[in-house]
Structures are given as structure tokens and as C-alpha cells.
Amino acid sequence: MGLSMSTYYADPKISRAEKEEQDADLRGKIEQIRVEFPRTGYRMLLHHLKRQGIKIGETRLRRIIEKFNLQFKPTKRFVKTTDSNHEFEIYPNLIEELMIDDINQVWTADLTYIRIENGFIYLAVIIDLFSRKIIGWQISKRIDRFLALDALKMAIERRNPPRGTIHHSDRGSQYLCDDYTELLTENGFHTSCSAKGNPYDNAWTESLMKTLKYDEIYMYEYKTYLNVVEKLPKFIEEVYNKKRLHSSLNYLPPEEFENKFANKNESEYQTNVSRPSFRL
């Protein structure tokens, strides 16, 4: 037809047959996006398509999703793995109402379980709160301090954070034990903890865990420890960090956001995460 991709999808003068062909083409593109991000909703789909050069209105996108029954189905919540019944020191919450506006300003940490055929294995992650990038992770058959320590060591080795970086976690014993807090102190971190029993206090890492589980682990039915150690690292490094769009990052993936932030004036990349607020 001699039209650009964006014009092609927006042209009101095309025939009925051409429109059907367009719908089928869009269906294919939506399904390709959903392969990597099964829970992607209407708004995020619009931004994924836009990055491919396709301009389409939300009304038409909704029509196509309904026409081809492409809606994603809500999934159940998963259980947290926090062990807060311990005698280690509890630290104050340092990020409540904090203006978060830089890389390596706040790191958050969390643990979760992964159900496989013969039991459970466990994942620990460290996230840069400003960019949402997973900067450290570890997988283990045991949920202990070594799992959390290895994820932290990876993050420190990769980022070489400045002294004064805040490390925020829930009140789990893995993050407040002597080995862990000593490593934080040695590297100049300020330690911060969530308020007791507050489900919103560490919502960013919980949201990430949900993404990992429902966009990858549950979707592809990991059955063995080998499945997890072979596939999950690739999803973290190649899909989540490099491809998953975040509305709070101006609809950019974490790694791309960090690269642009490093090369541009930071005022161009202020995000909604700047002022977290909590109901305590």
C-alpha cells in the first residue's frame, strides 16, 4: 500500500478485507508481546506497540483483544516467606516520604519461594528502587542467610555503590542477621526496615516477585530445580531488565531507563516513584 506502519493502522479509508488483515496482524503482534509478558494490559500493550512503530487507539485495541479473546485472566496471590520472629535489631524505615531520584540511592531486597514437583526452591533479589532493575539475585534449595548474602554480594560487585546507599527490606531474619548487616556496614550502607505488618511498605519488590512468577515461572510450569536455574536467570537478565516496560519509568525497561538517565539531565527522567507514601 506504500504507507508507513503507523499510517497503515490508522488509515480509515482501507477496505473491509484490508481491515481484517490488519486485525489479524495486530493479533499476532499482541500474542508475541504476551509470550514474554502474559499479564500485559491494554495501556502497556499500547506502549509496546508504539515502540514497534504502531499507533493504535485504545478503543480499537480493546476491540481486537475482545474479538480474539486475548484477555489475560487474574491469578491468585502467593505466600510471602518473611521470618520476622527473631531477636536481631530492627532498623527504622528510612525511605518513608523520601525523594528517590537517583540510581544506587535505595536498594530493596526480598525473598520468595518457587514451587516445583518435589517441593520448593527459593529466590532472593536485590532491586534498584529508582530504576526497578534487578541488580542481584540468587537461587537456592534452602531459604537461609547465605541465599540473601549471595544476592547482595552480586549486587555490590556489579554496582560498586557509593557509601550512604540505603538497603531496605522487610524484617526477615535473613536481612537482619549479623553476617548480613556486617556486610552492609562494611560497604557503607544505611539499613532500613519496613513497618511491622504493613503490606504496602515493600510493595515494589512484591510486585516484582509477582511479575517473575506469573510472567515466567507459572506460565512455563517450572517443574525441577534444573528448570529454574536454566531459565529464570535468562528471564531476569534478558527479559525483565531489558524488555519489560514500566509506567513509572516513562514506559521504558529498567536497563534502557538507566542508560538514558546516565546520559541525560535527570530532570527529564523524574518518575512516580519519587515520593513513596504509606498508610502506617
What positions do the PLM features span?
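Basic, flexible linker segments flanking DNA-binding modules
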Residues: 6-103, 198, 253-263
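Active-site beta-loop-alpha junctions of metal-dependent nucleic acid enzymes
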Residues: 119, 138-160, 176
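An active-site-proximal beta-strand-loop segment
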Residues: 100-135, 141-142
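C-terminal domain-tail junction helix/linker
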Residues: 16, 178, 185-189, 211-280
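Mobile genetic element proteins and their domesticated derivatives, centered on retroelements
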Residues: 1, 8, 30, 45, ...
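Acidic/histidine-rich, metal-coordinating catalytic segments
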Residues: 162-177, 195, 252-253
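Conserved, non-catalytic sequence blocks in retroelement Pol enzymes and Pol-derived host proteins
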Residues: 37-39, 99-101, 116-117, 171, ...
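RNase H-like polynucleotidyl transferase catalytic core
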Residues: 74-80, 167-171, 185-204, 219-224
